């Protein structure tokens, strides 16, 4: 299939791997963060880390929308279903994220909450049309990729006068999170997390373009290469980052030119700006409170804001102490560093959010990488 098969071509990937081995300087270590969970999944699925030279290391970032959702936000959705009698609609992965009191949306549903999995906000709108006597809340999460559909859903609800529909808006923003990582003590002070550059997200960049990454690439001297999700995309992006580091450059480059432009999708951006605005701050799992890193519904559209309609008050809840999800989201640790990975915490029984979604670092490592952690002993045959 055009635009897919050629980006999964093993011969091309091997040629790029050869170039990386030739161009990665022997006396230097390279450390690049793939921000997006889709890239984390691709790196694990296609064994990309094994194709890289030993001195080129990939670090998982917080780009999985389900993973960065804090417990307190899940608690609000559960509260709406169990205490307020609302129909809560959300995406499938969100249903299994652990919340307080050993609950999740799935377990709250088992307790009698009317919680439904949907594929889009349009599905939630249809439920609101069919059940006008019930309050219907769309629990909207995700990065800039899923934000325009949420804004469109709110606009359609207003046009149709659906007074029983509202949105619990938990959309988050990529550039603010990357800046927060670069300002973190692990990167700036202690050197615990050496970062030489970023593999920029694909779908997010289709919406926002490459321009929003330019300020911190210049300010922090960290190159960014936007890449598609196929293995050749990722390999080429890593090669481009190595070349930038070797040449002392720190600019934004676009490997994913078949889908991403500098300005992004202006129509989608205008729709989001019409309905949503930036929050002063928002808690991310693993990162804590991140300034200007999320969106809320504008005052003009407050009739469709579930937080305002139900008088919800957010309460921060600490993560399970045994779970290393926060450190993994910051790039400080890897899934194998967590003591409960693969024992207490599995995809069937996730303790942390990183094990829930296929884009989570722990779930990806469970599916494609956990057997690499097992030491292999070669025994001489008699």
Predicted regions span which residues?
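Phosphate/pyrophosphate-binding betaalpha-module
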Residues: 139, 143-212
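Hydrophobic alpha-helical scaffolding
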Residues: 6, 67, 139, 143, ...
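Internal helical hairpin/lid segments
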Residues: 236-327
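Metallocofactor- and cofactor-centric catalytic cores in central/energy metabolism, strongly enriched
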Residues: 1-133, 147, 157-160, 168, ...
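A conserved active-site cap/scaffold subdomain adjacent to cofactor or substrate pockets
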Residues: 188-261
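A generic structural motif
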Residues: 58-64, 165-172, 225-229, 255-258
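Conserved structured core elements
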Residues: 14, 122, 143-147, 171-172, ...
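Alpha-helical structural signal in soluble globular domains
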Residues: 51, 108, 152-160, 215-219, ...
């Amino acid at each position: 299939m055009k635009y897919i098969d050629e980006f999964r071509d093993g011969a091309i990937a091997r040629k790029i791997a050869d170039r990386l081995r030739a161009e990665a300087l022997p006396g230097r270590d390279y450390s690049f963060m793939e921000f997006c969970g889709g890239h984390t999944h691709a790196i694990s699925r296609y064994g990309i880390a094994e194709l890289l030279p030993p001195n080129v290391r990939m670090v998982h970032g917080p780009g999985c929308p389900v993973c960065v959702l804090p417990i307190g936000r899940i608690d609000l959705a559960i509260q709406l279903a169990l205490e307020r009698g609302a129909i809560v609609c959300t995406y499938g992965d969100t249903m299994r994220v652990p919340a307080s009191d050993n609950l999740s949306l799935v377990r709250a549903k088992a307790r009698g909450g009317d919680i439904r999995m949907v594929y889009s906000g349009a599905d939630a709108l249809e439920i609101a049309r069919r059940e006008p006597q019930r309050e219907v809340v769309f629990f909207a999460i995700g990065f800039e990729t899923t934000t325009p559909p949420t804004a469109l859903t709110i606009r359609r609800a207003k046009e149709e006068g659906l007074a029983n529909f509202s949105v619990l808006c938990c959309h988050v923003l990529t550039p603010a999170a990357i800046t927060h990582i670069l300002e973190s003590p692990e990167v700036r002070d202690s050197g615990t997390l050496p970062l030489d550059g970023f593999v920029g997200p694909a779908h997010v960049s289709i919406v926002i373009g490459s321009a929003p990454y330019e300020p911190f690439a210049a300010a922090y001297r960290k190159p960014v290469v936007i890449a598609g999700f196929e293995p050749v995309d990722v390999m080429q992006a890593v090669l481009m980052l190595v070349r930038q580091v070797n040449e002392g450059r720190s600019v934004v480059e676009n490997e994913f030119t078949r889908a991403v432009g500098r300005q992004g999708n202006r129509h989608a951006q205008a729709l989001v700006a019409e309905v949503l605005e930036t929050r002063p701050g928002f808690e991310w799992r693993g990162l804590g409170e991140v300034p200007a890193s999320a969106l809320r519904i504008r005052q003009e559209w407050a009739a469709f804001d579930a937080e305002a309609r139900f008088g919800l008050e957010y309460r921060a809840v600490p993560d399970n102490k045994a779970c290393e999800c926060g450190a993994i989201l910051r790039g400080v640790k890897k899934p194998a560093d967590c003591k409960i990975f693969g024992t207490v915490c599995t995809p069937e029984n996730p303790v942390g959010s990183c094990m829930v979604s296929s884009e989570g670092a722990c779930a990806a490592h469970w599916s494609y990488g956990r057997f690499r952690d097992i030491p292999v002993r070669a025994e001489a045959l008699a």
